[in-house]
C-alpha cells in the first residue's frame, strides 16, 4: 500500500484552522493554547523542566515561577476551579457529534486508517464522526511540521487540526490522537497516579521531564474510574527514555500475578470505553452496530422490560449503502401518540434526524429503508406495564438510486475487505444542467488482466446499456471521471474468492466554469478541472499572485545539457521592473557555453538601466564574465566550472525586444582539445613560410626568315 506523503497542503489553502503547531506550548503530543497555560499551574512545570516548555519552534520558553506566598487571592481561587477539558462543558462535543475533514495530502490507505480509527471509537461509545458539511466547529486531519499532535477536546469557534505526522499513520496512534480530540488527557497524568506507577526521573531525557507531570484533583475529572494500566492514553514504560532499555514509568504492583503492561496502541481498553461513555452521557443500554447485518432487542426480551429505561442503537453501514430495518416482534404498552413506552426510528445519525416512525403496542411496523447509511433507534419506557418488548433485524443494501449533488460511495464494508459475492448498482443523478464528477480516494480490487472476477464498471448514463466509461480493477486509482449528462451508472461486483479493501470515491455536480462569458475570470487561459477550474498562461508568462492574471515569466534552475533562454515576453518587448535569474548546472567535468542569437536592451555605456550579467557559478559574487546591454551581440561565453548564472534586469522606463540565447554543455577535455586545436591552427598559420612567387624570365629568340 502507498503510505507516501504529498506535502502539498491542499485543504490548508482554503481552511483557516486552529493549528496545533502554533500552540503556546506542548505537553507531549498535546497542544496547549494560552487559555490552557493560564489555567494550569505553570510553576509546577518549570520546577521539573527548569524552563523547558517546548514551543512550536523547538525552542524553550522561560516562564518565571511566582514566589511562594505571593499568589493573589484571585489566583488561589482560580487554582481550585476545575480546569481539565473533560470537566469543562465547552470542551465536550455537543451530542457527541464530531464533524471531520481529511486533508488532500493523504493517500487512500491513510484515509482508510483514519476511518477505521473513527469507527473504532464509534463502535464502543456513543461518539459519532461525521464528514463535515456546513458545521462551524470540526476537525481537520492534516500533516503539520510538528508531527503527531492535537488539542484536547473541542476548541470551538471554527476548525481545529489533528496532525498525523510521518510514522504516526498507524491505527493505534490515530485512535490515541482521537482520544485527545474527544477530550482525554494522558492516563499517567491523573492526580492519583503515584499510587499506581513510579516515575524513574533519572532515566528521562533531559528537557522532557515536564511530560511526566501529574494534574491536581481540581484540574482533571477522572469520572470515578479506577487507574487504567491498559488505557490507550497511557505512556509506554520507556517513553522519553535516555535509552531504549531504560524504564521511565513502571507499575507499582502486580495484577493477577504479573506486572501489567502499559502503553498499548492496539484498541480501546474497557476503562477508555467506560470513561468516554460517562463523559458523553451515553445511554445505559444500546450500542453502535456496524456489521452488514444483525439484530437487536429491548433489554430482557422476551421476558419483559423495566420501567424508566432509555436505550439507543446506532446503525452505521458503509457510505453508499442503505439500511433495511424490520421489526420481528413488538409488545409495548399502548398509549395515545405512544406517549409512555415507544420506539423511535430516525433517518440519520442522531436524535434530530428526520423521524421515520414512533411505535408502540403490538402492531409490527412495515419495513423501513434508510435514505443514507445510518439509522437512529431510541427506546424509552415510563410505565410499569410488563410487555415482551421488541426485537428487530437489519441488513445493509448496496446500490440504489442516488439523487444528490454530492456524496460518497464506498465498496461494502470499506475500509475493511469487501464481502464475497456482492453485486451493487448505483444510479447517480445530479441537478439538471450539470455533469457528474467522480474522484477516487482509494482503490484496491482483485487484479486481473480483463477484470473478470472483481471489478468496478462505470457507464455514461442511467442504465447498463449506456456507453462504457471503463471497467476497473487492480491497485491503481482510476483517473477522474466526468459524465456527459447529469447521470452516471456504477456497478461493483465481487466473486466468491479473493477480497480486497475495495474503493472509496466522491461524486459531485460538475460544471464547466471556463464556458462562462468571463472565461472564469482568467486573463489568458482557463482550464476546467473536475470540481473546479484553474487559470493558466501562454508560454513565456506565469500566473500572478491573484492566480488569474498573467505576467511575463523568467528565470529558473536548469540541469539540461542544452537548451535556450530568453527575456520575458520574447519576442515582444520585455516588461518593466523584471529581475530574472537562470542558474544552469551541468554534470561534473562539464563546462557550459552560452551563445546569444538576438540581443537588444536599453543601451548605456555602463549598463546601468537594463542589462544581462553572466557569471561562472551560482551566486551573485561568482566570477563575472560580462555585463551586457545595448544592441551589440556578445561573444560566446564558456563557464569556468560546471555551472553558470545569468541575470536579466530591467528598470521602469524604456523596454526593448530583449534577448534570445542557446546554451550547451560539453566535457572539459573536449573543450580544452578544441581550444588547443584552435591555438595550434593559429600557430601554424603564423609560422608557415612565405610563398615566393616565381619569377618569369623572358628570353629573346632570334627568328630566321624561312628560305
UniProtKB/Swiss-Prot annotation:
SMART domains: CUB, EGF, EGF_CA, ZnMc. Glycans are attached at residues 62, 105, 295, 326, 562. GO terms for biological process: cartilage development; cell differentiation; dorsal/ventral pattern formation; ossification; protein processing. One of its GO terms (molecular function) is metalloendopeptidase activity. Binds 1 zinc ion per subunit. InterPro entries: BMP_1/tolloid-like (IPR015446), CUB_dom (IPR000859), EGF-like_Ca-bd_dom (IPR001881), EGF-like_dom (IPR000742), EGF-type_Asp/Asn_hydroxyl_site (IPR000152), EGF_Ca-bd_CS (IPR018097), MetalloPept_cat_dom_sf (IPR024079), Peptidase_M12A (IPR001506). It holds the Pfam family Astacin. It is an enzyme of class 3 (hydrolase). Zn(2+) binds at residues 176, 180, 186. GO terms for cellular component: extracellular space; Golgi apparatus. Residues 57-90, 682-707 are annotated as: Disordered. Proteolytically activated in the trans-Golgi network by furin-like/paired basic proprotein convertases, cleavage is not required for secretion. Residues 84-283 form the Peptidase M12A domain. Residues 68-81, 690-707 have a biased composition (Basic residues). Gene3D superfamilies: Collagenase (Catalytic Domain), Laminin, Spermadhesin, CUB domain. The active site is at residue 177. Disulfide bonds join 126-282, 146-168, 148-149, 285-311, 338-360, 398-424, 451-473, 514-526, 522-535, 537-550, 554-580, 607-629. Its main location: Golgi. Residues 285-397, 398-509, 554-666 form the CUB domain. Metalloprotease involved in pattern formation in gastrula and later differentiation of developing organs. Able to cleave chordin (chrd), suggesting that it may act in dorsoventral patterning during early development by regulating the chordin (chrd) activity. This is Bone morphogenetic protein 1. It comes from Xenopus laevis (African clawed frog). The lineage of its organism: Eukaryota, Metazoa, Chordata, Craniata, Vertebrata. The gene is bmp1.
Amino acid at each position: 500500500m502507498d503510505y507516501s506523503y504529498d506535502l502539498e497542503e491542499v485543504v490548508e489553502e482554503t481552511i483557516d484552522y486552529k493549528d496545533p503547531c502554533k500552540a503556546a506550548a506542548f505537553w507531549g503530543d498535546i497542544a496547549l493554547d494560552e487559555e490552557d497555560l493560564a489555567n494550569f499551574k505553570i510553576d509546577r512545570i518549570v520546577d521539573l523542566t527548569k524552563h523547558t516548555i517546548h514551543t512550536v519552534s523547538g525552542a524553550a520558553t522561560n516562564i518565571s515561577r511566582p514566589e511562594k506566598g505571593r499568589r493573589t487571592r484571585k489566583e488561589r481561587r482560580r487554582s481550585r476551579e476545575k480546569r481539565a477539558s473533560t470537566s469543562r462543558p465547552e470542551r465536550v462535543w455537543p451530542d457527541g457529534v464530531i464533524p471531520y475533514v481529511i486533508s488532500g495530502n493523504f493517500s487512500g490507505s491513510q484515509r482508510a486508517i483514519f476511518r477505521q480509527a473513527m469507527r473504532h471509537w464509534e463502535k464502543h461509545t456513543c461518539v459519532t464522526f461525521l464528514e463535515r458539511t456546513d458545521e462551524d466547529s470540526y476537525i481537520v486531519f492534516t500533516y503539520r511540521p510538528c508531527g503527531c499532535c492535537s488539542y484536547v477536546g473541542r476548541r470551538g469557534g471554527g476548525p481545529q487540526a489533528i496532525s498525523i505526522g510521518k510514522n504516526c499513520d498507524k491505527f493505534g496512534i490515530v485512535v490515541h490522537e482521537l482520544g485527545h480530540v474527544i477530550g482525554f488527557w494522558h492516563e499517567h497524568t491523573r492526580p492519583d497516579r503515584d499510587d499506581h506507577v513510579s516515575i524513574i526521573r533519572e532515566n528521562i531525557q533531559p528537557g522532557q521531564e515536564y511530560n511526566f507531570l501529574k494534574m491536581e484533583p481540581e484540574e482533571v475529572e477522572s469520572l470515578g474510574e479506577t487507574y487504567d494500566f491498559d488505557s490507550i492514553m497511557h505512556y509506554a514504560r520507556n517513553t522519553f527514555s535516555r535509552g531504549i532499555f531504560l524504564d521511565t514509568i513502571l507499575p507499582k504492583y502486580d495484577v493477577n500475578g504479573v506486572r501489567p503492561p502499559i502503553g498499548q496502541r492496539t484498541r480501546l481498553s474497557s476503562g477508555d470505553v467506560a470513561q468516554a461513555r460517562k463523559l458523553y452521557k451515553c445511554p445505559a443500554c444500546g450500542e453502535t452496530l456496524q456489521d452488514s447485518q444483525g439484530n437487536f432487542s429491548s433489554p430482557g426480551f422476551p421476558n419483559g422490560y423495566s420501567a424508566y429505561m432509555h436505550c439507543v442503537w446506532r446503525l452505521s453501514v458503509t457510505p453508499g449503502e442503505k439500511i433495511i430495518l424490520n421489526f420481528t416482534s413488538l409488545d409495548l404498552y399502548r398509549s395515545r401518540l405512544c406517549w409512555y413506552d415507544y420506539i423511535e426510528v430516525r433517518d440519520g445519525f442522531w436524535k434530530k434526524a428526520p423521524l421515520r416512525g414512533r411505535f408502540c403496542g403490538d402492531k409490527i411496523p412495515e419495513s423501513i429503508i434508510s435514505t443514507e447509511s445510518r439509522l437512529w433507534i431510541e427506546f424509552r419506557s415510563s410505565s410499569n406495564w410488563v410487555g415482551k418488548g421488541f426485537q428487530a433485524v437489519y441488513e445493509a443494501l448496496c446500490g440504489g438510486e442516488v439523487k444528490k449533488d454530492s456524496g460518497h460511495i464506498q465498496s461494502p464494508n470499506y475500509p475493511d475487505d469487501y464481502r464475497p459475492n456482492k453485486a451493487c448498482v448505483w444510479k447517480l443523478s445530479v441537478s439538471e444542467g450539470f455533469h457528474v464528477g467522480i474522484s477516487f480516494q482509494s482503490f484496491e480490487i482483485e487484479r486481473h488482466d480483463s477484470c473478470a472476477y472483481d471489478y468496478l464498471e462505470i457507464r455514461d448514463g442511467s442504465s447498463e446499456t449506456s456507453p462504457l466509461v471503463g471497467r476497473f480493477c487492480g491497485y491503481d486509482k482510476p483517473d477522474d471521471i466526468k459524465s456527459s449528462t447529469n447521470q452516471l451508472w456504477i456497478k461493483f461486483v465481487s466473486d466468491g474468492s479473493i477480497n480486497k479493501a475495495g474503493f472509496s470515491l466522491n461524486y459531485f455536480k460538475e460544471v464547466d466554469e471556463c464556458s462562462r462569458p468571463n472565461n472564469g475570470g482568467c486573463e489568458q487561459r482557463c482550464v476546467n478541472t473536475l470540481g473546479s477550474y484553474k487559470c493558466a498562461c501562454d508560454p513565456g508568462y506565469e500566473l500572478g499572485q491573484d492566480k488569474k492574471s498573467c505576467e511575463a515569466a523568467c528565470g529558473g534552475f536548469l540541469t539540461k545539457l542544452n537548451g535556450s533562454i530568453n527575456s520575458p515576453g520574447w519576442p515582444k518587448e520585455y516588461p518593466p521592473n523584471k529581475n530574472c535569474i537562470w542558474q544552469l548546472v551541468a554534470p561534473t567535468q562539464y563546462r557550459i557555453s552560452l551563445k546569444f542569437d538576438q540581443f537588444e536592451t536599453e543601451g548605456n555605456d555602463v549598463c546601468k538601466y537594463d542589462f544581462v550579467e553572466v557569471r561562472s557559478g551560482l551566486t551573485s559574487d561568482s566570477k563575472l564574465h560580462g555585463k551586457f546591454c545595448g544592441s551589440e551581440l556578445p561573444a560566446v561565453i564558456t563557464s569556468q566550472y560546471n555551472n553558470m548564472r545569468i541575470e536579466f534586469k530591467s528598470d521602469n522606463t524604456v523596454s526593448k525586444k530583449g534577448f534570445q540565447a542557446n546554451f550547451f554543455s560539453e566535457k572539459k577535455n573536449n573543450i580544452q582539445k578544441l581550444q588547443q586545436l584552435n591555438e595550434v591552427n593559429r600557430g601554424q598559420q603564423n609560422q608557415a613560410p612565405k610563398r615566393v612567387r616565381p619569377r618569369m624570365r623572358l628570353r629573346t629568340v632570334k627568328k630566321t626568315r624561312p628560305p
